[in-house]
């Protein structure tokens, strides 16, 4: 009896936070991962722990040329991709009393443009993959505006729109698209968040739950609905 080959997945933002937790879960399940992050050391540590399962493709995903080269390296090593998980991104909080447009430029470049570069590099590989699946992360702040998240909300709304439009465009090509909205997860990116977080997920639990839901390939995976009462009164 032939064995089902392990899925080949490109995971961005794998050096820390949700990305690192997703990588841990996926590698433990036997998947083969192409891991991207700016910091190489965490990726090397995973490669040492899971020999033969990790393809190291670090780089600056805001640099379109570097992303093209990453795509070429994955193609040379594997020939195709079964999944792309777009997790890389940043979260910046802005005080409206000192609004700084350079912050939204940074957020858009790091989150929206980098995701677009990765999609461009991966689509030829996904078309050649086995039941291909594109997973993009867009924050729940697109549904629930919070203080100091104007820039994050605008960028993540763009991400969500891009992913949902791609779902329509890529369906005839056999590529499924899922938008993942994790909500509050216990990562360093929420340390500056000074609003109540009534349903703050532990990192490992969030990663396991996300992957369980993603396997079903729904259009959207949103963590448990927020208890709105926990947000009032808002801080002054």
What are these regions (language model features)?
Residues 119, 155-156:
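Active-site helix of classical SDR
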Residues 87-93:
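Conserved NAD(P)H cofactor-binding loop of Rossmann-fold oxidoreductase domains
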């Amino acid at each position: 009896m032939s064995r089902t080959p392990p899925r080949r997945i490109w995971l961005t933002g794998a050096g820390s936070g949700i990305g690192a937790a997703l990588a841990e879960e996926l590698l433990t399940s036997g998947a083969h991962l192409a891991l991207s992050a700016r910091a190489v050391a965490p990726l090397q540590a995973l490669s040492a722990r899971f020999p033969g399962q990790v393809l190291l493709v670090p780089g600056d995903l805001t640099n379109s040329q570097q992303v093209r080269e990453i795509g070429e390296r994955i193609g040379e090593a594997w020939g195709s991709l079964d999944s792309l998980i777009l997790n890389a991104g940043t979260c910046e909080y802005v005080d409206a009393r000192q609004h700084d447009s350079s912050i939204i430029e940074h957020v858009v470049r790091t989150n929206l443009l980098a995701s677009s570069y990765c999609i461009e590099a991966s689509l030829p590989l996904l078309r050649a993959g086995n039941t291909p699946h594109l997973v993009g992360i867009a924050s729940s702040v697109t549904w629930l505006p919070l203080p100091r998240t104007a820039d994050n909300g605008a960028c993540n709304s763009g991400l969500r729109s891009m992913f949902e439009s791609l779902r329509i465009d890529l369906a005839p090509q056999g590529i499924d698209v899922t938008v993942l909205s994790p909500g509050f997860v216990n990562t360093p990116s929420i340390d500056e968040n000074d609003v109540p977080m009534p349903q703050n997920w532990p990192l490992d639990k969030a990663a396991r739950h996300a992957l369980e839901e993603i396997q079903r390939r729904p259009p959207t995976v949103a963590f448990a609905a927020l208890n709105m009462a926990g947000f009032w009164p808002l801080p002054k």
